């Protein structure tokens, strides 16, 4: 079920009503009905769409609450300064789960997300469970039907479980099994968060991955080269971040908290090798769970990631 953006979420400190250099995002955001959006001849600006769904987390036996994530992120983002002076920033609202099967909600989200991707220079998809990634893939493939897609996931988990239905832990297996013209790179894998069968599947499918342990002090030149080579080898990049990759000291409000997770600045350093590329069609950020957040710490962290990713 799709609902348009809620203006009441977008509030913040007012420093000026006339000087754009003192504006914050709540002063520049606009609201549109994505279901009625016509294709633009020239993509421009930024589109934001929320995936207010945690059914996939429940099916994956995780702790629910991430369906409240998109609104919490938008509220935190609203008060940040508009340093980029975006040519356009549109909140398209959220998609909610009201179908019998999760896959139908994912398809509905994908149809709408594809419109944003086709019309904007940047599209941010805010979760919600990490089943958003499969929906993001469907949207990407709709916009780019023949191009090679490189999927980059900053995550503690492979999320390549073999299940009978979509969950927050199956997205990347679904993508790889359905589409031979895709490849998968995972940054931040937790050795204690993935079974041997998942490592075996990674070997079988030639999934490139980097352990969290390799990213704790710095991002080495070897890893930077790996990322840049992966971007270079693909026509389109689908970029996604699962917030459970970040240590729970910084990100307590997630579906599955990390005890040996990454520092936020490490995630930013990794993203610097990805975001600047014009090949990046969309960015999704998943598993922000306000139910377990402290002082809105995780919501603010996601908001600041989006803020840093703006071009």
Curated annotation (Swiss-Prot):
Catalysed reaction, written as an equation: N-formimidoyl-L-glutamate + H2O = formamide + L-glutamate
Cross-referenced Gene3D superfamilies: Ureohydrolase domain (3.40.800.10)
Binding-site residues, Mn(2+) 2: 155, 157, 242, 244
Keywords: Histidine metabolism, Hydrolase, Manganese, Metal-binding
The record's free-text note on cofactor binding: Binds 2 manganese ions per subunit.
Superkingdom of the organism of origin: Bacteria
Cofactor: Mn(2+)
CDD domains per record: Formimidoylglutamase
EC number of this enzyme: 3.5.3.8
Residues noted as binding Mn(2+) 1 in the record, renumbered to the chain: 130, 155, 159, 242
Molecular function in Gene Ontology: agmatinase activity; formimidoylglutamase activity; manganese ion binding
InterPro entries attached to this UniProt entry: HutG, Ureohydrolase, Ureohydrolase_dom_sf
Gene Ontology biological process: L-histidine catabolic process to glutamate and formamide; L-histidine catabolic process to glutamate and formate; putrescine biosynthetic process from arginine, via agmatine
Known pathway: Amino-acid degradation; L-histidine degradation into L-glutamate; L-glutamate from N-formimidoyl-L-glutamate (hydrolase route): step 1/1
Function: Catalyzes the conversion of N-formimidoyl-L-glutamate to L-glutamate and formamide.
Protein name: Formimidoylglutamase
Organism ancestry: Bacteria, Bacillati, Bacillota, Bacilli, Bacillales
Gene that this sequence comes from: hutG
